[in-house]
Amino acid sequence: MKKYDIAVIGAGSAGLTAARLAAKFGVNVVLFEKHRIGGDCLYTGCVPSKSLITAARDIYKSQNLQKYGVKATVKLDFQAVRNHIHSSIHHIREHDDSRKVLEEAGIEVVEESVTFTNKSTLRSASGEEYTFKKCIIASGSSPNKLNIDGLKQEHIVTSDTIWSLNKLPKHLVIVGGGPIGLELGQAFAMLGSRVTVLERSDKLLGRFDQEVSEAVMKGLKESGVNVLLNASIEEVREETELKLSIKAGDKTEMYVADKVLAAIGRTPNTSGLGLEQADIVFDERKGIEVDDKFRTTSKNTYAVGDCKGGPYFTHLAGEQGATALVHGLFGSKRKVNWSALPWVFFTTPEVAHVGASESELLSSNRGYETEILNYDQIDKAIAEHHEGKVTILLDKKRKILGATIIGENAGELIGYYAYIMGAGKKLDSLAQPIQAYPTYAMALRQHASNVQTKAFTNTFIPKILLKLRGY
């Protein structure tokens, strides 16, 4: 039997963050991973999807250079795109997530599945037992399965399995209009696939304000994606080709497709861990029950990342892993600041958000002021032919309640507002540092300065000060 201070189950973002931090503090840590070190983010999520999106955008742009007087004919080599994706994965794995790198950092890595035998012991698939003082479960999540009568599994791909496609689909039907479905759908459309997205509700990205939904819908249509709202697959026919009877609203049409992407959410991975043996309460659909420090109902065990339920973000999983680790070791009062959690959708246009939406503030009857910066006021955006909009919701003291950015670099820029919110500062703080011109950061600084100046000049103070100084 081997003894450890910290045992971590799962080598995705949450587990790796916790294990690395534990090793830096000098405690004895073991990391278990039954599949691949790096988790979904590295192999089937963030890294491959963003590599695909980058390739798709570049290829799409190369076909649309008429405004510069360039006429080009582009021939796609899908295998080259796949090579680019796998190269990105390999590079990140080798310098960041390999077993060698982790062991050099002082982490013992066990590439086996484990189960709880009691509240302080784990048993590996090979029969080895490990005791721990604290355990952090970071077992991740899996794509929900699509079950439609007549639709064979060989025709279905998920965000996990779509990367094994050897050729570009002629027609990809996507069930689910969330971020994953929209990002992948638009990327495949830019590469040349015919893409149809089926969203069961009457609005895309329902959590967000109508303006976001409309902007994304417009961008999808411009890149060739056919979005059907209030839509579902009613019938499946398998003849010489796959035929889908799709109902959208009160209209039903037959579509021919070669692949169906199931993008209908994710389910926490809780089975096979022996959670019952450690008296850990969980729900197969919602995940492992935790408190605000991510402690489970077994006081020495924590659950972080996807296994405790959404939101399913890599950056959030990492933050939870660190929070659980420092609480387990030091009893830290550190908590995740949910109000300053940024969301980014890597569609074209890119969308980023932090804090409350306007509809949420309206429904809660909370007062706010709206400040808007359009991209046609940003010199860099004008030079690069980018359209977009920054919307900031402020309280009376100019503290940020929420911010939404639609347009180029939205994901990079939202970090400014997330930091200000997380630090409890005013928008004014963004006006303090000098930014280089011409950059988007400079535009955000100038906008914050304008808001601050407007608020100041609307008071009686400037007039009194000027009069006292003889003006």
Task: Tell where the protein language model's regions lie, with residue ranges.
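Flexible, glycine-rich terminal cap/loop adjacent to redox cofactors
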Residues: A7-H35, V47, S51-D58, F346-S357, ...
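FAD-site-proximal beta/loop scaffold in flavoenzymes
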Residues: K152-P169, M254-F330, Y416, A431
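Short hydrophobic core segments
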Residues: I9, V114, Y130-G140, I174-V175, ...
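Glycine-rich dinucleotide-binding loop and its adjacent helix/turn
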Residues: C46, S139-R194, L198, N226-V227, ...
